[in-house]
Amino acid sequence: MPLKPEEHEDILNKLLDPELAQSERTEALQQLRVNYGSFVSEYNDLTKSHEKLAAEKDDLIVSNSKLFRQIGLTDKQEEDHKKADISETITIEDLEAK
């Protein structure tokens, strides 16, 4: 896991000390190198995850749109069928009464 920003800043401030021993300077630089590697790795993982989720979201939007269109067509067909049923129930008596 990458270093927290405060930890990273502490290491950088430590490196500014001109009296810092070479071994400590090497260790601090190594920590920064490892931190950078883990940061890049985590960034790449998150980018891949984001791309995957974005693609899944797009697929779901398309599927949802298709379902809404299908439901809309089904509802319209039911309304048309109800209208047809109503028109078929008119009897001669109904016509004579009008």
Curated annotation (Swiss-Prot):
Function: Scaffolding protein involved in the icosahedric procapsid assembly. Coassembles with the capsid proteins to form the procapsid. The scaffolding protein is found within the capsid as a serie of concentric shells. During DNA packaging, the scaffolding protein molecules are released from the procapsid.
Coiled-coil ranges from the UniProt annotation: 40-62
Keyword Coiled coil: yes
Provenance organism: Bacillus phage phi29
Alphabetical GO biological process terms: virion assembly
Sequence similarity: Belongs to the phi29likevirus scaffolding protein family.
Protein's UniProt name: Capsid assembly scaffolding protein
Complex formation: Homodimer. Interacts non-specifically with DNA; probably binds DNA in the early stages of DNA packaging.
One GO cellular component term: viral scaffold
Keyword terms, alphabetized: Coiled coil, DNA-binding, Late protein, Viral capsid assembly, Viral release from host cell
Top-rank lineage group of the source organism: Viruses
